Amino acid sequence: MKNKALFLDRDGVINVEKNYVHKIEDFEFMDGIFETLRYFQEKGYLLIIITNQAGIGRGYYTEEQFHILNDWMLSEFEKEGIYITKVYYCPYHPEHGIGKYKRDSFDRKPNPGMILKSQKEFNIDLSKSILVGDKESDIQAGKRAGVNVNIIFSNNKNGDELDCCKKINSLSELVSLIL
């Protein structure tokens, strides 16, 4: 039997968007994230994070710093009884990357690479899955991969001008939208 997944962008969906968050002291969970993820976990969704991390490519922080923050974030979720299936990240940037990080990548949203990797790794039925992002590139990745429901979290100006998909203004709206 195939799994269904809730795909989540990180910055701007799981945590408050700040410029290139890479330190624990700068990481602030979005209001309602724990309750929302707990609900979807209880409904049998795999919880998968897909995040572009151009700050690595630009040299603002290292992959090691990303992993330290990521491990802390996952432990905070676990304290709340929430288990993230996997975090996929893309450190590359085609224009502003430095050294080995300056390249295009099929994993970099709006490309669907991270979603398609997870589909294969966890036997995911994308037609029964949901993606939540806060930028058009998130939604494009979901659509290109064949994710059935793509939702823009328009808690900021990025989502307000888009006519691409369903919109929510708070994470609590996600639960009622899917019911």
Swiss-Prot record:
EC number: 3.1.3.83
Residues the entry annotates as binding substrate: 9-11, 17-20, 51-54, 108-109, 135
Location(s), subcellular: Cytoplasm
Similarity field: Belongs to the GmhB family.
Regions that span the bilayer: none
Active site: 9 (nucleophile), 11 (proton donor)
Site description Stabilizes the phosphoryl group, residues in chain: 51, 109
GO molecular function: D-glycero-beta-D-manno-heptose 1,7-bisphosphate 7-phosphatase activity; magnesium ion binding; zinc ion binding
Cofactor(s) for this UniProt protein: Mg(2+); Zn(2+)
Highest rank taxon of the organism: Bacteria
NCBIfam families on file: GmhB_yaeD, HAD-SF-IIIA, Histidinol-ppas
GO biological process entries: carbohydrate metabolic process; cell wall organization; S-layer organization
Catalytic reactions of this protein: D-glycero-alpha-D-manno-heptose 1,7-bisphosphate + H2O = D-glycero-alpha-D-manno-heptose 1-phosphate + phosphate
Protein name: D-glycero-alpha-D-manno-heptose-1,7-bisphosphate 7-phosphatase
Binding locations of Mg(2+): 9, 11, 134-135
A Pfam family assignment: HAD_2
Residues of the site described as Contributes to substrate recognition: 108
Binding partners and assembly: Monomer.
Biological pathway: Nucleotide-sugar biosynthesis; GDP-D-glycero-alpha-D-manno-heptose biosynthesis; GDP-D-glycero-alpha-D-manno-heptose from D-glycero-alpha-D-manno-heptose 7-phosphate: step 2/3; Cell surface structure biogenesis; S-layer biogenesis
Gene transcribed to yield this protein: gmhB
Keywords assigned: Carbohydrate metabolism, Cell wall biogenesis/degradation, Cytoplasm, Hydrolase, Magnesium, Metal-binding, Zinc
GO cellular component, one term: cytoplasm
CDD domains: HAD_HisB-N (cd07503)
